[in-house]
Every structure is written in C-alpha cells, then in structure tokens.
Amino acid sequence: MKLKLLLLTFILVCTGCKNDPRIQAAYDLIERVTPGYGEQFKLELMEPIDGMDAYEITSDNGKVVLRGNNTISLATAFNQYLKYTCNAHVSWFGNQLDLPKQLPMPAPVKNTINGKYRVYMNYCTVSYSAAWWDWERWQRELDFMAMNSINMPLSVVGLEAVWYNTLLKHKFTDEEARQFLAGPGHFAWQWMQNLQSYGGPLPKSWIDKHIVLGKQIIDRELELGMQPIQQGFSGYVPRELKEKYPDAKIQLQPSWCGFTGAAQLDPTDSLF
C-alpha cells in the first residue's frame, strides 16, 4: 500500500512539474531555438542557492537534464549546455547550431547567476538598434535575453501609442498628437525628454501596429518570468499643452543644438 502511494505521489509530482508554466515556457524556448530537440531534454525546477537564481546541467537515461529555479535559470542552463557541451553559439550576428541528431550528454554543472536584477537595454539601444524590428526579430531577442540570464529588460515598444491616446484626451487632435511624436529612429531622444516632433509625424498605422507589438513583447517577457521596465510620467509634455491649458504651470526649456526646448509640467500643478 505504501509503495502504491509513493508511486502515485511520484507520478503526480512529475505531471505537475511538466505542466508548470515556468517549465512549459522553457520548453517552448528550446523548440524556438532548436526545433525538434525539445524531447531530448528533461526540465525540472529546483530551489535557489543562498537566495540566488541557480541552475544545474546533468543527464539521465539518455536525456539532457536542465534544472533551474525559474524559467530564466532554465534558459541559462540551456544556453550553457549549447555553448560548452555542443560547441554551439547563439548571438546577435548569427547562430551556429549544427547539432547532431542525438545530443551529447553533458558533464554535471551547478552554478548560481550573479545579481538579483539583471537589466538589459536603454533608450538608445532600443531606438538605434530595434526601431524597425518586427515580432519575429523581437522573439529572437527575447529568447537571447532569457538565455543570457536577463530578467529586467526595458520595454518601451508602443510607448508612442500611450502618448497618442493620452493627448487625444487632453484637447489634442489626431494630427496634433501625431505631430508631437518623433520618428522611430529618434524615440530615444524623445523618451529622454530632450525634443519633440523631430522626424515625425508618425502615421496612425505605425501607432496601431506597435500597440500590438508592444503587447506581444510584454506578454512574452512575463511568460519567461521577466519584470519589464516601463516608463512612468515625469512631467515632460508637448510645448503646445501650454496653449491648451494656459493656466497650468508649464515651463518651456531652453533650446539646444538647434532643437527647440521641450516643456515641463510642474509636479505641484493639478494637471500633473
């Protein structure tokens, strides 16, 4: 009787682990990066080590066993296995994934991951490198992040739609709201609150498309166990807001390098 109960408990635990969304997200990543190889891996959850994210790589009955305390740790283990057991490579500039049909068994590895918060990207990175990326390219980048232990990426794709819809609620027309927004290659400077309108106006089709793309990116980041960094409001506003709300405490900033200065809404003003 005890043996039957023990066996039943083992089956339930194994089934529960396989259905765990953290494990499923890692399996999905493996299939995206190395299609058809997912069945050769066995993924398991483990406890953190001394409060730090951790992973293990080993083998069991002809399968590569990856253990981690979350999806990012499992993805890190997968990347380390590819690098140091398969001599494979996943990078921005190309992948070397010439893998044998039957994957080699690894030597046992157990490591912790440095740092609780592993931040990735800044405004310039997104604007200069990723301004024109589509969902296919973003999927590759998100997998690359997870495989390199990133758990807190900057996530500002679609921020232009937040501005657009907010301005429509504050006396701006469609044309005025779109005219305020800079072109995609100059978003970095606008999100850092140095300018407005340069390279614009944005077409409405761009705004609509990037609402969808931004949601896809955040959904995938959350699926992978990341904590996206999103922008709050600091008081930067369109210069034209002073015309819409003449009594608001709005300070026009000095011009710089040929650019007309931006505007700043006083945080003590009720409009803030």
Model-derived regions: residue spans:
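Aromatic-residue-lined binding/catalytic grooves and analogous aromatic/hydrophobic interfacial grooves
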Residues: 22, 83-86
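Conserved short beta-strand edge segments in small beta-sheet-based binding/regulatory domains
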Residues: 89-91
